């Protein structure tokens, strides 16, 4: 049964869905990392695919840019298609000099200037956090591949073009490991519907130094992040979580 934004049928999605912002990155992941991948949805060109990774059924689908967009897709995947785990695999900006372009960061929590979780939580602060066991599995996956990851809080911004750049200094002071636009919303939706979620991001640009990757690199590379996400699913299965 299709939803207003996803034209897949029940059973088309695996219980775990990797979600990049860019639907073309979803296509890239399906074509380069999954076996026997089949496209299951394409409404508004927000492509979704299901295949297998080392024999394990896994899906991948884009979620668009910003909390409103990703919240729609994550809600429908969990509520209507029975998805149990969401792994965001996206890009982020760095504000700390100790974090470099192309580093991989894991968001154990996500701060935000959005009010969406306050709306959900009756105007109280909600601690938007990842599932602990998913964080643990991702760390183990990175260690097994010899990839150094930074674990900490993300900041999910409402505005890409911020009118107050001084906020980046505050984020740096508070130890923010990456600035992006979705994790806090995804964690909020997962909590609302009793699912689990994790955001793994690759640093695409450094807000303070100006170093950045190209749009083509963001679409077609960042393979370490994808491998960590996929391996973490297998580790979670083996450990019973």
Curated annotation (Swiss-Prot):
<feature type="binding site" description="in other chain">
    <location>
        <position position="25"/>
    </location>
    <ligand>
        <name>phosphate</name>
    </ligand>
</feature>
<feature type="binding site">
    <location>
        <position position="5"/>
    </location>
    <ligand>
        <name>a purine D-ribonucleoside</name>
    </ligand>
</feature>
<comment type="subunit">
    <text>Homohexamer; trimer of homodimers.</text>
</comment>
<feature type="binding site" description="in other chain">
    <location>
        <begin position="180"/>
        <end position="182"/>
    </location>
    <ligand>
        <name>a purine D-ribonucleoside</name>
    </ligand>
</feature>
<dbReference type="InterPro" id="IPR000845">
    <property type="entry name" value="Nucleoside_phosphorylase_d"/>
</dbReference>
<keyword id="KW-0808">Transferase</keyword>
<feature type="binding site" description="in other chain">
    <location>
        <begin position="204"/>
        <end position="205"/>
    </location>
    <ligand>
        <name>a purine D-ribonucleoside</name>
    </ligand>
</feature>
<keyword id="KW-0328">Glycosyltransferase</keyword>
<comment type="function">
    <text>Catalyzes the reversible phosphorolytic breakdown of the N-glycosidic bond in the beta-(deoxy)ribonucleoside molecules, with the formation of the corresponding free purine bases and pentose-1-phosphate.</text>
</comment>
<feature type="binding site">
    <location>
        <position position="44"/>
    </location>
    <ligand>
        <name>phosphate</name>
    </ligand>
</feature>
<dbReference type="InterPro" id="IPR018016">
    <property type="entry name" value="Nucleoside_phosphorylase_CS"/>
</dbReference>
<dbReference type="Pfam" id="PF01048">
    <property type="entry name" value="PNP_UDP_1"/>
</dbReference>
<dbReference type="InterPro" id="IPR035994">
    <property type="entry name" value="Nucleoside_phosphorylase_sf"/>
</dbReference>
<feature type="active site" description="Proton donor">
    <location>
        <position position="205"/>
    </location>
</feature>
<comment type="similarity">
    <text>Belongs to the PNP/UDP phosphorylase family.</text>
</comment>
<dbReference type="InterPro" id="IPR004402">
    <property type="entry name" value="DeoD-type"/>
</dbReference>
<feature type="binding site" description="in other chain">
    <location>
        <position position="21"/>
    </location>
    <ligand>
        <name>phosphate</name>
    </ligand>
</feature>
<dbReference type="GO" id="GO:0005829">
    <property type="term" value="C:cytosol"/>
</dbReference>
<dbReference type="GO" id="GO:0004731">
    <property type="term" value="F:purine-nucleoside phosphorylase activity"/>
</dbReference>
<dbReference type="GO" id="GO:0006152">
    <property type="term" value="P:purine nucleoside catabolic process"/>
</dbReference>
<feature type="site" description="Important for catalytic activity">
    <location>
        <position position="218"/>
    </location>
</feature>
<protein>
    <recommendedName>
        <fullName>Purine nucleoside phosphorylase DeoD-type 1</fullName>
        <ecNumber>2.4.2.1</ecNumber>
    </recommendedName>
</protein>
<feature type="binding site" description="in other chain">
    <location>
        <begin position="88"/>
        <end position="91"/>
    </location>
    <ligand>
        <name>phosphate</name>
    </ligand>
</feature>
